[in-house]
């Protein structure tokens, strides 16, 4: 009996190893993984953690902006902000649906959010004290989100990748809306210009933190890159965001709140 059990365990290990090799071969060939496909348990758990955190962030992200719907400076601004908050709710629902394809139910996801077991982006805990914050959030926070999320349209898990296509299109609208608010303020009175600079000062660093820890300190990046859940490292995406955002700030006449930021001639 002991020998039989030992043989069974060896055979199970061989089968599991073969399945993992076939799985990684599909990943390496850029073949998407679908819900009915075999996947390592660690891959499934990693996706649940990432997708649920993403979904929670979309839902919680409605709160600081919803706060300003009744205080928007014009009917046009109010309608645009309502549309944006509505989009964020939809993004959360798409992502919860994607997470459910991995075998976890929505009630469990929400329970983990409410009990604090699950995380969401801490940037949404920062106060929104002026209307300029609505511009800075759209421009910087949604801009950072786009930088993170566009590569997810090519992530290895099919339902997540397909959900991200629509999410990214709508986030692009949000980013343009925020930048347009900042542009209007930068062309306004001296008080409005100061308001825009103040919002930029407060949201610049939290936006950079949205890309996660540095590559050397990231616990998950290496494996997520191997599985092609992620396509680029945290530091690569953060650098791209800086390269794109600094010229936009200069066009607005704003000063980047980092005296150590310099142009790298060697990188170009």
Residue ranges and their predicted role:
Residues 193-268:
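Extended, helix-rich structural scaffolds rather than catalytic motifs
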Residues 12-22, 79, 84-112, 179-183:
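Conserved alpha-helical segments that form or flank metal/cofactor-binding pockets of metalloenzymes
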Residues 7-43, 75:
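Extreme N-terminal leader/anchor segments
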Residues 43-54, 72-91, 134, 159-171:
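Alpha-helical scaffold segments that form or flank carboxylate-/histidine-based iron centers
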Residues 32-52, 112-138, 155, 188-192, ...:
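Acidic/His metal-coordination segments adjacent to aromatic residues that form catalytic metal sites
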Residues 104-180, 198-206:
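Active-site-proximal alpha-helical scaffolds that flank and shape metal-associated catalytic sites
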Residues 37-43, 60-83, 145-160:
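Helix-loop segments that flank and shape redox-cofactor active sites
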């Amino acid at each position: 009996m002991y020998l039989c059990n030992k043989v069974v365990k060896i055979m199970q290990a061989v089968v599991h190893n073969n399945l993992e090799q076939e799985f990684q071969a599909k990943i390496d060939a850029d073949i998407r993984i679908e819900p009915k496909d075999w996947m390592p348990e660690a891959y499934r758990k990693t996706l649940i953690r990432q997708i649920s955190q993403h979904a929670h962030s979309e839902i919680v992200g409605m709160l600081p902006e919803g706060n300003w719907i009744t205080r928007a400076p014009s009917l046009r601004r109010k309608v645009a902000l309502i549309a944006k908050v509505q989009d964020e709710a939809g993004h959360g629902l798409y992502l919860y649906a994607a997470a459910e394809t991995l075998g976890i139910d929505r009630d469990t996801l929400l329970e983990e959010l409410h009990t604090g077991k699950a995380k969401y982006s801490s940037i949404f805990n920062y106060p929104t004290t002026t209307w300029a914050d609505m511009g800075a959030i759209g421009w910087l926070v949604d801009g950072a989100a786009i930088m993170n999320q566009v590569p997810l349209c090519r992530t290895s898990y099919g339902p997540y990748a397909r959900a991200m296509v629509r999410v990214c299109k709508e986030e692009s609208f949000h980013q343009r809306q925020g930048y347009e608010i900042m542009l209007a303020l930068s062309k306004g009175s001296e008080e409005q210009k100061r308001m825009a600079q103040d919002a930029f000062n407060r949201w610049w660093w939290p936006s950079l933190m949205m890309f996660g820890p540095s590559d050397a300190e990231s616990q998950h990046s290496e494996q997520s890159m191997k599985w092609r859940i992620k396509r680029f490292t945290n530091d690569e995406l953060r650098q791209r965001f800086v390269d794109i955002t600094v010229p936009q700030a200069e066009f607005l006449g704003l000063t980047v709140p980092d005296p150590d930021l310099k142009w790298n001639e060697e990188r170009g």
